[in-house]
Amino acid sequence: MFTPRGFKFAGVHCKIKRKRKDLGIIFSEVPCVAAGVFTTNVVKAAPVIYDMEILKKNPNGIKAVVVNSGVANACTGEQGMINARRMAEKTAEELGVPVESVLVSSTGVIGVQLPMDKVENGIEEAARVLSNDPLPFAEAIMTTDTKVKMHSTKVMIDGKEITVLGIAKGSGMIHPNMATMLSFITTDAKISEEALKKLLKLSVDDSYNMIDVDGDTSTNDMVIVLANGLAGNTTIQPETDGFWKLYEAVHEVNQVLAEKIVEDGEGATKVMEVHVINAPDIKSARLIARSIVSSNLVKTAIYGEDANWGRVIAAAGYSGATFDPEKLDLFFESEAGRIKVAENGQGVSFDEEEAKKILSEKKIRIILDMKQGKETAKAWGCDLTEKYVEINGRYRT
Amino acid sequence: MFTPRGFKFAGVHCKIKRKRKDLGIIFSEVPCVAAGVFTTNVVKAAPVIYDMEILKKNPNGIKAVVVNSGVANACTGEQGMINARRMAEKTAEELGVPVESVLVSSTGVIGVQLPMDKVENGIEEAARVLSNDPLPFAEAIMTTDTKVKMHSTKVMIDGKEITVLGIAKGSGMIHPNMATMLSFITTDAKISEEALKKLLKLSVDDSYNMIDVDGDTSTNDMVIVLANGLAGNTTIQPETDGFWKLYEAVHEVNQVLAEKIVEDGEGATKVMEVHVINAPDIKSARLIARSIVSSNLVKTAIYGEDANWGRVIAAAGYSGATFDPEKLDLFFESEAGRIKVAENGQGVSFDEEEAKKILSEKKIRIILDMKQGKETAKAWGCDLTEKYVEINGRYRT
């Protein structure tokens, strides 16, 4: 894992959870330009409301993010807001930075107040053990995740080597009260506030916003990007060459993390990747890709290894996009091969044995060629299994 | 079951399906004013496209509906349109009525052409056995439904006794390629075309449009109302006294049928009824009720008899409606009692034993009091079970 210059990480166990690490800090030696994308849920957790305010006031002066897992600090009213602010204050005290330079994040059960004594002890300890190793932080933000989710890459811009490192969590298949998706991207690129905002929005629309585990949007979802400028490149402005180079790097990180989130669910046995190609416009392409990947009927068909093309076409049809259904070609693809199952909106005869072989793989691509434009979109999801129902039916608040 | 004056029904087995009845006709002795609401899916089955055209051209002259089950005639291209039209022609020939007075409907597997020889034999036979008994028709439109779905009521308008009879099918839990929702309402009321259209739209918005079985919208869904005027009342005009009286009767029929559709699914063990009350506006009330009833996490919680209020609040939050989450009160209710689980958007302590007892019933009401307006909406759905996944994962195209 590459670590961008000037960032330090920590993850500790402060006993919000019984055994595993539950509190983490990211710290930058110098102030960062920061941008965030937050849950669209009307019911927003206290840290989400807190961070939106901080990023409005101080987008060029962020020095730290403090995150706890185990308790979401959502549906917690006024006391929740006081606790979110206290997390920032305590972190600022321990790190010797201004309060308004600290962002806060939580993930875990809804409707429970944070145990602030434990949280404050955790912050003290984490501030003492900051290091170049991002792994303890990645572990500390996990809830029901079974795997750590990190990805990094490097890119040359303006003769300078720039590093991008992303750390995420999210696992909707298991205890979905804890299904929050969190992602923290750090980079040593130098970039303007406007450019960073634009870049993050563009990338999120084609990564985290295109994954579906169970269709339910958490109260705590957030993606934060911190750029501390230590690579020493000329400040990147919107839609310049440097902008697109950094975009590619950040987007690689976000797409890899989004796929890792989809892959990681005990209930899931398969990953679906839906490609919508030759769509009339980008909005329709995205609507259709998301609709297919979110359909319970498509999810169960993939689980059952059934080349049920009618369900895919129907899901495209109710996506909300307007299009000519009589132009659609549909393919299923995997390591084992590729098969055409529909042409011009109608089924074609295909070898059931071959289809079965293709669908028996772990990663299935569903390719919908709309033949009515040039836009494309990709979405990722997983299958729907008895295990999902079992786990979510049994889970107790 | 009350039957409106002048309507006759038939249902026969013409071997599209192996054993059960698969072709039905509704016939009115005199021309009907007719209105229809059709699937919003962009991918529309041939009979849907055909009927939309007929109702545009001839809304005051409908005399019959012919319906087959077993094959949906969806994703069947030009041949599908030819076959839909041929069903109407054959029915018109056998009944001695104009072709443009016949509506067509299909439900069953997608992507397969109708076996027209069997269908035509079925139409011949059905036309011969028309009677006052609606039961054979109700049986003939079933696919994976385990129960016949009919409801009738009477209302006095203008000194005349008016009868409304509805016959429906729909069962998304089992073989969802056949999950089409069909509903045919017959009445002997005399009503203007404009009034009938308005009345149907109003009622559908608060009945069929508020049920969720698996979130997937069929290519074949349709609701048709036929009014033949034989009750002899003065023609009902929009928003008169008579209009609202007939609305109440039709709406009773539609709500009962909608609930029967939700109840009938082998995979389902419980029915949920979501009441959103004191909402800021009707659109928000409906969005929120539908969002809750469609949430996989709420569905599995109900299945698991878990008073997981956080999932309900979160589903309200991502519904797309804008509201103040800090005003929400939430209750679970059933035959066994009623319990408050959240107040002003936050959890309240409640007796877990009592909650368990309430949620162990077959019919669960979730009541969300928004305390920010006067509008209400109801939605119906069922739980999500391992059985649903098992059935849909195994089902083969």
Curated annotation (Swiss-Prot), chains A, B:
Superkingdom of the organism of origin: Bacteria
Keyword ATP-binding: yes or no?
A: no
Q: What are the binding positions for substrate in this chain?
A: 143, 169, 180, 266, 392, 397
Q: What is its EC number?
A: 2.3.1.35, 2.3.1.1
GO biological processes? L-arginine biosynthetic process; ornithine biosynthetic process
Supply one GO CC term from the record: cytoplasm
The annotated active site, in chain numbering, is: 180
> Site (Involved in the stabilization of negative charge on the oxyanion by the formation of the oxyanion hole): which residue positions?
107-108
**What Pfam families does the record point to?**
ArgJ
- Give the UniProt keywords, A-Z: Acyltransferase, Amino-acid biosynthesis, Arginine biosynthesis, Autocatalytic cleavage, Cytoplasm, Multifunctional enzyme, Transferase
Q: Which CDD domains match?
A: OAT
Query: What family is reported?
Result: Belongs to the ArgJ family.
> Per its record, how is this protein called by name?
Arginine biosynthesis bifunctional protein ArgJ
Which gene name belongs to this protein? argJ
